[in-house]
Amino acid sequence: MVVSVTIRRRFVLLLLACTCLLSRRLCFGEDRITFSSPIKDSESETLLCKSGIFRFGFFTPVNSTTRLRYVGIWYEKIPIQTVVWVANKDSPINDTSGVISIYQDGNLAVTDGRNRLVWSTNVSVPVAPNATWVQLMDSGNLMLQDNRNNGEILWESFKHPYDSFMPRMTLGTDGRTGGNLKLTSWTSHDDPSTGNYTAGIAPFTFPELLIWKNNVPTWRSGPWNGQVFIGLPNMDSLLFLDGFNLNSDNQGTISMSYANDSFMYHFNLDPEGIIYQKDWSTSMRTWRIGVKFPYTDCDAYGRCGRFGSCHAGENPPCKCVKGFVPKNNTEWNGGNWSNGCMRKAPLQCERQRNVSNGGGGGKADGFLKLQKMKVPISAERSEASEQVCPKVCLDNCSCTAYAYDRGIGCMLWSGDLVDMQSFLGSGIDLFIRVAHSELKTHSNLAVMIAAPVIGVMLIAAVCVLLACRKYKKRPAPAKDRSAELMFKRMEALTSDNESASNQIKLKELPLFEFQVLATSTDSFSLRNKLGQGGFGPVYKGKLPEGQEIAVKRLSRKSGQGLEELMNEVVVISKLQHRNLVKLLGCCIEGEERMLVYEYMPKKSLDAYLFDPMKQKILDWKTRFNIMEGICRGLLYLHRDSRLKIIHRDLKASNILLDENLNPKISDFGLARIFRANEDEANTRRVVGTYGYMSPEYAMEGFFSEKSDVFSLGVIFLEIISGRRNSSSHKEENNLNLLAYAWKLWNDGEAASLADPAVFDKCFEKEIEKCVHIGLLCVQEVANDRPNVSNVIWMLTTENMSLADPKQPAFIVRRGASEAESSDQSSQKVSINDVSLTAVTGR
């Protein structure tokens, strides 16, 4: 009996092994196709990239009423079918007889049940079929490669995009070939065939992102200024500070790329001709829409016709710009604005050119200023400076408008002005050429208004003059040049990191008067005090218009605070991201130095995590969202912004929460801006917070992205456990949090680290994964730690196999008591007798 059971078991194992050999992809999820290993739809075979993010094979669109089969690439771990590329979009197969294989000519091909060619990469490859293979990369790129030339890429799906724009993909024009890589929409949400809409970079003088319907523009972004497209509202333009960039070379090639390493973003053109940027929410199990365009009716290309400007939210939305009237009043008043507007009065330079009609007289034309505008299409470049730009336009009779942007330079327009829009908070100033009579009209109106005002002012001036004679002459008080000197020092901080053309003009940062901030905080009263930072107190305030603010006031007793405050202004004034706190302005008067931020009503993360009364407010889903949000903000600092920034003081008290408990990273006083080619730096003055500093930074002064990752790992473990890293666990021989988490991990009880207030059996695997990720982040050797993009990927990917963590860093401190946060200590100590490194605890 025992022998028969043993034989039976061996037979079953042999059968399983044979099954795996016959269909290796089903067992191991191979990522490549060779001549001898095709993919058969009838056997449900697919390719899976090594990371498990993307899958390639046959599919039928969700909700499709047909059984048509397409070949494409889609997200594997996301439960909502999200296809990012389709091969045979216009030639589907009617059944499951399709095969994907390396064809006899070495190309990747799709054939149907009758062995008819349905689709092919169609590359001229004079090689034998066994000389090529196809691999699905972790980026979602499908590559046909030549194994004779070190894997030379013969064809790739990223060079043949469909409706989705992926990280590491490029769109744009090729000056050498004349080609233009664009997105193309599906016909409908359940029909992948070629739709009516395309989107891509238009090769204008100043590149713009456009959407076309059957080659007719339906939306445009406005010109690229080096950081954003200037024709987008504020919130939409943030997208292009979040990893997108435009590049051009001397050969006419213009390309748009996405620098974000996280593949949980989806940027696609939908069948209705709308571009969406989304990111995947693991907790909500859905795609969250970040931005979309067009967004309002005013975004429609040429909505108000020639010389018409669109005002979203107003009724009617279309208005003729100053100096112009509707071309057809009846149509205009009836809501048909397509014919646009025409001039009230002809230009003087046009009359001069029309000598046959007796022209040549009259006063010179001038310009009317339109503020916060989306500039018209088809601008031309001029090398003129900001001061000379108006004259260049005025001297050219065909020039109808000009504008100046520091990132672009002088822009000129000739002929009709089309697709203008008025914004509330973004846009640039546009100057439109009008006849002198139009200027005179506005001038006369100004005189009518100003005359009585000037009269009153003259009388008041006489009274003041008479009053002044009663007093002796006194020396005029010295002009307060605090702000001017401060800004000069701040701009000096940026000069080593950026070229002059890319520097932010710090003088454009709003300046608040001291009295305004004093009034808004009720003279900095204790009841408005939100907390005490390492460099001074923070107060809640309310501006006259009702906006709530947070005011950080530099303590005069802080010897190092001025440098950190200046550094914070330099760093944060350049950053825009939904997971970073927003700087509204500053105050520099006399000895007063203050920063003004958006107010975060829920205060800081530590106020909830470590308060027994508030811990339950942060349920597990909220804590997970906070961890993900912190990662996205940190990824922006490290990779996606135009600067590379290391925070150096990431901790729970520097994570602020908005009204929806979304996290925002704050306190950039210790942040360092890196050059593009820098990966690490060192300092003789180590500043930070005990318990959050990485060992290489605390011991040797070396810091890099991985230093912030260490701090991130500590925060992860604090969020999971609801305990401070600096606190000890008496039940475990006074182990700190890292040591305690490491012990639980080795004992196979990682989920036991979770805060009992939020632990739920249904989240146990996710909690274990987060502990695992936290321990990977706090490994002692910096190179062993993941980067932030990998942390995001691990967080947002289900059923992913993670590397085992190595022992965390345990730092033994001598000569100083534990400093729990920057709120309590600012003393200097020495660590492990490293005398050259001054460590400033916060």
Swiss-Prot record:
Gene Ontology annotations for the cellular component aspect, listed alphabetically: extracellular region; plasma membrane
Documented EC number(s): 2.7.11.1
Extracellular side: 30-444
Keyword Transferase included in the entry's annotation: yes
Modification Phosphothreonine, positions: T683, T837
InterPro entries (UniProt xref): Bulb-type_lectin_dom, Bulb-type_lectin_dom_sf, Kinase-like_dom_sf, Pan_app, Prot_kinase_dom, S-locus_recpt_kinase_C, S_locus_glycoprot_dom, Ser/Thr_kinase_AS
Catalytic activity: L-seryl-[protein] + ATP = O-phospho-L-seryl-[protein] + ADP + H(+); L-threonyl-[protein] + ATP = O-phospho-L-threonyl-[protein] + ADP + H(+)
Species the sequence originates in: Arabidopsis thaliana (Mouse-ear cress)
PROSITE patterns from the UniProt entry: BULB_LECTIN, PAN, PROTEIN_KINASE_DOM, PROTEIN_KINASE_ST
PAN domain ranges (all copies): 349-435
Gene Ontology process terms (BP): immune response; protein phosphorylation; recognition of pollen
Protein name from the UniProt record: G-type lectin S-receptor-like serine/threonine-protein kinase At1g11330
Annotated ATP binding sites: L530, G531, Q532, G533, G534, F535, G536, P537, V538, K552
Residue ranges of domain Protein kinase in the record: 524-810
UniProt KW S-adenosyl-L-methionine keyword: no
Active site (catalytic residues): D649 (proton acceptor)
Region (Disordered): 814-842
Annotated glycosylation sites: N63, N94, N122, N130, N196, N260, N328, N336, N354, N396
Residue intervals annotated with topology Cytoplasmic: 466-842
Subcellular location field: Cell membrane
Residue ranges constituting the Bulb-type lectin domain according to the UniProt record: 32-157
Signal peptide start and end residues: 1-29
